[in-house]
UniProtKB/Swiss-Prot annotation:
This is Ribosomal RNA small subunit methyltransferase Nep1. It catalyses: a pseudouridine in rRNA + S-adenosyl-L-methionine = an N(1)-methylpseudouridine in rRNA + S-adenosyl-L-homocysteine + H(+). The keyword Disulfide bond does not apply. Its EC number is 2.1.1.-. The keyword rRNA-binding applies.
């Protein structure tokens, strides 16, 4: 049986990480960990609570943004494309971890519960351990792309070729296994070496979750109108 046509969406260089060793003793980290009754090294770095500590880190102004991953995943997993089994989503982090996400996964809407889930994932390597709806592996972005083995790679980039979303959907539809890479950081450029056709969907920079929505919806109609009977 031939493989089903799917979009492979990668949130790359995501600012999702546990607290780095060099700031474990910072008061902002220690106090937050005490309130949560967790060890400092087990908590997820979050600029909302750890802003003072981030000033001591390289790239501190862009780090500690698990909220970006949270919103992107909520939107992607609840999309029609995912419900029709035409989407696979991955998260690649700044420290070269990859989160594999089963399409049936339903993430917590509540942000604090999501943070708790991510902390469990980084500690255990899979959650829940018996089902592995989320699985964490050490892997570079390029290793992930090689593993997916797409027939086309597109990188969403503000310096890319300007293309309206509808036309980008038509372009994606020309391939059976396209991969789209979206930066999971608030500003700046990719840290990882990223190869692919650079595409921009708007004349101004957009947040990652907006790009996720535009990419999915642009591809959604092109694919679903051909394969689904639910909309006829």
């Amino acid at each position: 049986m031939s493989e089903k046509k799917r979009l492979h969406l990668i949130i790359a260089d995501a600012e999702l990480e546990t607290v780095p060793e060099q700031i474990l003793d910072h008061p902002a980290i220690v106090n937050y960990a005490k309130r949560r009754k967790r060890k400092p090294e087990k908590i997820i770095l979050d600029s909302t609570y750890h802003h003072a500590a981030l000033k001591q880190l390289e790239d501190g102004e862009r780090r500690g943004r698990p909220d970006i991953v949270h919103i992107c995943l909520l939107n992607a997993l609840d999309s029609i494309l995912n419900k029709e089994d035409r989407l696979r989503v991955y998260v690649h982090t700044r420290n070269d971890y990859v989160i594999y996400i089963k399409p049936e996964t339903r993430l917590p809407r509540n942000y604090n519960r999501f943070i708790g889930l991510m902390e469990s994932l980084f500690e255990k390597g899979a959650v829940p351990e018996d089902l592995e709806l989320l699985r964490l592996e050490r892997k570079t972005l390029q290793e992930l792309i090689n593993e997916i083995n797409p027939d086309a790679v597109f990188v969403m980039h503000e310096e890319g070729e300007l293309m309206i979303p509808k036309n980008f959907g038509k372009l994606l539809d020309k391939f059976k296994k396209p991969a789209v890479i979206i930066g999971g950081f608030p500003h700046g450029d990719f840290r990882s070496r990223v190869e692919g056709v650079k595409i921009s969907l708007y004349k101004e920079p957009l947040m990652a979750w907006t790009i996720v929505n535009e990419v999915i919806v642009s591809y959604e109609w092109e694919v679903i109108k051909k394969f689904s009977t639910k909309f006829i």
